[in-house]
């Protein structure tokens, strides 16, 4: 049962990025933890680390985070009690901000359309590889999350920068970037050149409407055509938008951590590459088959193809009329 008292959660959440709770160091993954094979390139996502720093530095953000999780828990409980009526699919308008130095970084309109199509398939549960969801997890799959994406605009800007960091410089025109378009009402995605080992990162819903709110993705991992293997199926955007809609990494960013979702099996840490099912690890003395094919793990694009029903509920709570990202709703 993945549920923590909020005060305990906040203390854990604001701890150092690599603390991993000393009491959990005895938990075992043994030889069953999936690691990269055939490629040294691993998925790297800085969203949780950036969030921790932001929460440490801003009492206002901590308050918004507290309110966000309280509303999410209420939405989940109300849904169980039949108090939430279906209000249909939410369509989110997207602005893609392209910062390019080379022609390959100036991604084409067709590649942007391709990425939007991947998001709509993955969040609509119509992705062709959903057929690969193991029988044991079929009853837990989200299916249609009832969130769709529509390209509203593309903004392009030439730059001389050869690399970008996670300091949000790409989000300010004053630092050579592109200012966000109405971040309360649009999902802004910045596509930039090299970010080193980071494929992308995102802000969480407590940052809704702030100047830096949105998703950043390295051009090499945006879309499909021309993207770099093994992250060339558009799933970096699927993963990062999951953070934007309040999903944590499936391992809870700690050894046997908590992702605040009850139907995702607890796991010792991230999985990489293309694991073979079933993949087991042990947490709390219990051996479990892990949901490594979840979009919020670190496996290669070809190995991830599902959200869980619990994750769907968390995302729906954020875009609901009372949610932190209600401003994104299009009717």
Positions of PLM-derived features:
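C-terminal motif of bacterial Sec signal peptides marking the signal peptidase cleavage site
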Residues: 13-16
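Sec-dependent signal peptide recognition
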Residues: 2-7
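Bacterial signal peptide processing site
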Residues: 18-21
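Stable alpha-helical elements in mature extracytoplasmic
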Residues: 108-115, 233-237, 308-314, 324
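Metzincin-family zinc-dependent endopeptidase catalytic domain
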Residues: 114-278
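Short, histidine-centered active-site or binding-site loop motifs used for metal coordination
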Residues: 96-100, 221, 300
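Propeptide-to-catalytic entry region of secreted or membrane-anchored zinc metalloproteases
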Residues: 27-183, 320, 325, 331
